[in-house]
Structure formats: C-alpha cells, structure tokens
Amino acid sequence: MEEFQVYLELDRFRQHDFLYPLIFREYIYALAHDHSLNINNRSGLLENVSSANKYKYSSVIVKRFIFRMYQQNHLIISANDSNQKQFFGHNNNLYYEMISAVFAVIAEIPFSLRLVSSLKGKGPAKSHNLQSIHSIFPFLEDTFSHLNYVLDVLIPYPIHLETLVQTLRYWIKDTSSLHLLRFCLYEYCNWNWKSLITQKKSILNPRLFLFLYNSHVCEYESIFFFLRNQSSHLRSTSFGVLLERILFYGKIEHLIKVFVNDFQDILWLVKDPFMHYIRYQGKSILASKDTPLLMNKWKYYFVSLWQCHFYVWSQSRRVRIKQLSKDYLDFLGYFSSLRFNPLVVRSQMLENSFLIDNAIKKFDTKIPIIPMIGSLAKARFCNALGHPISKPAWADSADSDIIDRFVRICRNLSHYYSGSSKKKNLYRIKYILRLSCVKTLARKHKSTVRTFLKRVGSGFLEEFFTEEEEVLSLIFPRAYSASRKLYRGHIWYLDIICINDLVNHE
C-alpha cells in the first residue's frame, strides 16, 4: 500500500475522507482489473471464469466511461433496458463490472491504511504465515484437547441491501461513495444472497460482495468480542434489557459506554480463558470448556442478537451444540473431532507392580469422503457412486493441457489434505482423478482405456502424480524413515491462502 501511496494521491483524499474522486482515475480501473486476474490465477479454480475475463475493456473504453459518468443523465440506465441498450458495442453488464471492481478496490483503502499504521513500530510481521488456512489447525490441536463443547454457527446473510450500506457508514465517511454503492446495488443488481456465501458464478464481482459481507460480520463480531471480554457467562435475565439497549443505541462505540457505565451490576463477570472463536467464510465455531447450560445461553444470545439488532431472522438450528468427544465438526473441508487413545503404563513400587490405564485426547482430522465424491461428481470427474468418468469438456484440449489440469487439481488436493490423520480417503480421491484423466485421454483418441494404456505404458502418469512421501524424501534425504513416519501424521502448510472449489463442498 505504501508504494501506491503517492500514485493514488491518498494523502490529499484522506485529509477529508474522500474516496469518491478516485472513481474518476483511470489507473484505479487498471489496478482493479489486474487484481482480478491475479486472484483468478492464484485461486486454482476448475472452470469458474471470473468476470474480469468475461469483459475485456481497454483504456479507451475506460476513458469514455469516465467521461459519461460526468454526465449524470447518461449514467442512469434502467435495468429493464439492459438487454436492449449497448455501450460502444458492449453489454451494459460492463458498467456493473467496472463500477463494482473499482469500488471494491477503493473501499479497501481505509482498512489497508489502518493495517499499515497498526503494524508500524512492531518489527517485521510474517503475515504470509498467518494468512495460511492451515495455520488454524495447529492452534486447534493445542487447544481442543482441553475443551468439551463447540457451537457450530452458520452465520445468516443479510436480507436487505440497506443493511450492508448502513454498516459501511460507521467506517467510510464519504457520503458520495455510499450513495454510488447504494445506487449500483438497487438499480443494477438482483443479487442472490445465498450465492454470496458460497461464491457461485452468479456473482458479478465476488470481491466487492465478500468485502460487504465481511464488514457486516465484523460489526456483529465487535459486539460479541466486547461481551466476551467483559463477561463470558451472561445471566438469562439480562438478555432482554441487553438487547433493548443494543437496539436503541445501534452504534458500537455507544454500546461500549452503555455496557461499562450502566450494566456493570447485572453482568456476571466470570472470565472463561478456555473460550475460542474462529470464523471462515459463512461459518464460525465457538469452543469452550463450559457446561451444556452455558453453551445454550450463548446459542440463545447469538440468535437474539441477529434478530433484534440486525433484523435477520435466524432459526435456532443454525447454531448447533456439539460435543467434541462424540460429534464431528465440519470445518474448512475437514471432519474434526477428539479421539481417545488408550495408554497403558506399568508402574513398579518395590516388589509390587501394577498397570495404569490412561486415555489421552488427540485432535483427529479426516477427509469427508462422501461430500468430496459429491463435489467430484458435480464437477463431472465421477458419477454419484464414485466411479471415475471422462471429462468431455476437456477432450478438445492438447494432451499436455489435459494432463496438466488433472495434475494441478490432484496436487492441490493432496497439498490441502496433507493434514488428514488417515490418508486412505486421499488415495481414493487421487485414484478417481487419475483414472478420469486416462479416460479423458482415451476419449480424445477414440480408444478404450486398456488400449490407450497398452500404447503409452502403465507408468504413463506416474511421473506427473508425485506423492507427498517422495517430496519429503527429497527434503529429508538422510532421514527417510523419519520422513515416512512424518508423512503418516499431520502436515500443515503455511502457503495455502484459498480453498479449492472441490474442497468447499456446500
């Protein structure tokens, strides 16, 4: 962000909290377009073509578009006439794409500046390690063995567009930018809020709506974190008055004053050091060592907060209480639970010896094979029963491109599921992808699988599907046996910043 500070003229705009003038800068559109391309190439998606690739716009189109934005009458276009009207040979969806992409870049500027200023004076921050999704699991391994219950929360999405705009009012003081955002949302877009959470293809600009959704979630989390720090055990009698005050004041800064000054006597201040909160996308988990009664109170609090403060109707089944020793937790593409490992210790005192049976809790992660087969079947790599099939959509590509696609998917899944305690399901997924690749190549050459393998050899694909065990043997050449033992355990990588579509099965 510092290298673009002068280029974006942020100092002059930040003095008055004005972001709206940046919409009329040509280089902002170039930055937004380049960022969309980088995200699409880095995510490793299967067949999802981002909107940045759909609409190729040049600098000439950007200049004409900015010129027409100065003319307010030409900017206002009815959504009902979007199919009939054309803009210099392009569909009006290009308008929506350009505005949404630019606003996503501009809206993130205040938060990026806050992050840069907060990191000053703290030394070099290794943020690339903290960005990895796998960095969560070592934390879960260390903490979950001491916890009992988990609240599995499915965060509801806002039912009205104005809710998202009102949330940004607390952080962005530029009224013109908020009016432009409201104008685009109401006039141009018919958004499916469920697709907002699952990132379906129907979203015109996922980055913008993920930013809006995260802003909405951040507001409710700010209230939750304050209450969690002030009081972990809320009495049931305080919920009614508490939510009335939340509804009355509305803003978080007013909430803090009210809670500290007026409600200190009715909050039961009992700290719970074993409470942990984790969120990713539209799901969050609240793990604690509390009793089922207290976990039910937190469940009631979540539902009441969404309904009374955010006007979101949330059913109680969206918040489920799970016991770690009995139930599996579906989070980040893994089935996680606590497994008891029996341990027998022989103790001898003088002439007497006796055995001591101990049960050690161990954090266990498994691959959800049934949802994974469903994702592979949806992507047409296999049928509903898990039998591999050919990929007709890729049969027209070159052999090297077909193999490269399958290899990339296979390695990404193997890389992500390296933390599984049992690799049997991972081998099954690799088998499906490997045989699907062979069937796709055989379909292209109009032959059977057996005939194709006889012609190219049975070891044709072995060099492309490098096992993680072979990679570890290259890293630890002097301790190959130790690397094999390491491979059987959990391996968490610190370079995974996004989830493949196949893993994100919903």
UniProtKB/Swiss-Prot annotation:
Subcellular location: Plastid, Chloroplast
Membrane-spanning ranges: none
Major localisation: plastid
Any single GO BP term: mRNA processing
GO cellular component terms given for this protein: chloroplast
GO molecular function: RNA binding
Superkingdom of origin: Eukaryota
Entry-linked InterPro entries: Domain_X (IPR024937), Maturase_MatK (IPR002866), Maturase_MatK_N (IPR024942)
Keyword annotations of the record: Chloroplast, mRNA processing, Plastid, RNA-binding, tRNA processing
Functional summary from the UniProt entry: Usually encoded in the trnK tRNA gene intron. Probably assists in splicing its own and other chloroplast group II introns.
Xref: HAMAP family: MatK (MF_01390)
Entry's family note: Belongs to the intron maturase 2 family. MatK subfamily.
Name assigned to this protein: Maturase K
Organism: Carica papaya (Papaya)
Gene: matK
